[in-house]
Amino acid sequence: MAKDIYFNEDARKSLLSGIEKLSNAVKVTLGPKGRNVLIDKKFGSPIVTKDGVSVAREIDLENSFENMGAQLLKEVAIKTNDLAGDGTTTATVLAYAIAREGLKNVSSGINPIGIKKGIDHAVALAAEKIRKSAKKITTKEEIAQVASISANNDTSIGEKIAEAMDRVGKDGVITVEESKTFDTTISYVEGMQFDRGYLSPYFSTNKENMSVSFDDTYILICEKKISTIKELLPVLEKVVNTNKPLLIIAEDIEGDALAALVLNSVRGALKVCAIKAPGFGDRRKAMLEDIAILTGGVLVSEELGLTLENVELEQLGQAKSVKVDKDNTTIINTGNREQIRERAELIKKQIEETSSEYDKEKLQERLAKLVGGVAVINVGAVTEVELKEKKHRVEDALSATRAAVEEGVVPGGGSTLIEVAMYLDTVDVSKLSYEEKQGFEIVKRSLEEPMRQIISNAGFESSIYIHQIKTDKKGLGFDAASFKWVNMIESGIIDPAKVTRSALQNAASIAGLLLTTECAITEIKEEKNSAGGNYPMDPGMGMM
């Protein structure tokens, strides 16, 4: 297919035009007085949102060159959202500001490579300043403040997230689901839960809800498939003598082994339940090892020189209680806390080392199952449109809160970026080249843009307020919700440091890419034939 090619100024201007259009659509959502964006969907009701990344994801432009620019900026929003869970609108505003100011300099003949070096230098100093300025958060109230701001100042969502995090811990699993009622509630699952149910309903101890409930339970954790009852007899006899129930977790239990277990359970000779091991392949083995450590048992594996026939009671895991239904198993653990902590540290190290997003997600799931249990936030709303919008906000707030716990918080409302710009004013740039100084200045000016937009969205002229913030003492800022000058930290107007830092770094990365672009190539779109098409006349047909 034929290609269309733009060079130099034409390429950069077209890309900037696309960036500007996406930025204009996203920036109106910034701040407590941010406006809504209405998005038409091909199927179902339109979506109303104030979530920057949701707006960005929906934008595709007709002009191919402009669309490339828009897609570059969309990448900033998505990457920031993936990394920190929030700050997508801030990143978008910063990226457009840096790109716009940078292109003015490139158009006047300044070397873009030098400008980019200056931008990178300023951003590195700014990111370090943000890290050092961060204040660690520890209390439930501080967590609620961060979550509320990320949820567009919805304090009820902030309180729910703080409550869930307080219960399951910062490494615990918190999931967001759609509720079947109008109310937003939290439900908890203590201990470890995984998605494997019993192999036979005849194991049920509660016939009303068809579930198994055991207290003070032995757990046999086996890596291999169990097919014959003969393999199990030695360990079954030992457990029967203790009069305690037994949960068997293995790759699979089938044939006469399963039949014999069901028969003994129905007759009441032995309280027993059998389930398949969670996961697949190497992950299954790792999860079985997790369960063994969680319950203080040993994984029965021939690799370790341990067979079913040789298992002793002290090698079985133990649990305060076990609950099994047709879909899930929950184990309330009694394992050694020190061993559990060491296992958690090992998994954290694996998370840091892996480059696969899928592996990282699965490792985080394992970590959460080990250390904190699971909290489920069930989001309720009156209409489906409101439900989807609210669920988006809860998910964003949850991610931002995790970022805040990880790296701490800084004053919000764009005031931290103003403070960083003032800090950059004090940096000695005498050794930088002229081009690098221009790049450095671009970052300083661009850092004001998020606050300008927040004030503008609130209906005020930003220049007066920006000047006052620069002359007032550190820590003060403009609360766009109440239209007052306040101490941002004391008033709970805070942002996760990771969100602010990631927004700036991702914005500068894409803007620098645009400044150093000399050529843009895209496919020429084929013109579609009109629906009524002109059909060729049959040569054999004469005129009427």
From Swiss-Prot:
- What domain of life? Bacteria
Q: Which organism was this protein described from?
A: Borrelia duttonii (strain Ly)
Q: Under which main EC class is this enzyme filed? A: isomerase
Official protein name in the record:
Chaperonin GroEL
Q: Tell me which CDD domains the record gives.
A: GroEL (cd03344)
Q: What lineage does UniProt assign to this protein's organism?
A: Bacteria, Pseudomonadati, Spirochaetota, Spirochaetia, Spirochaetales
Protein's gene: groEL
Q: Where are the transmembrane segments?
A: none
Q: Name one GO cellular component term.
A: cytoplasm
UniProt keyword list: ATP-binding, Chaperone, Cytoplasm, Isomerase, Nucleotide-binding, Stress response
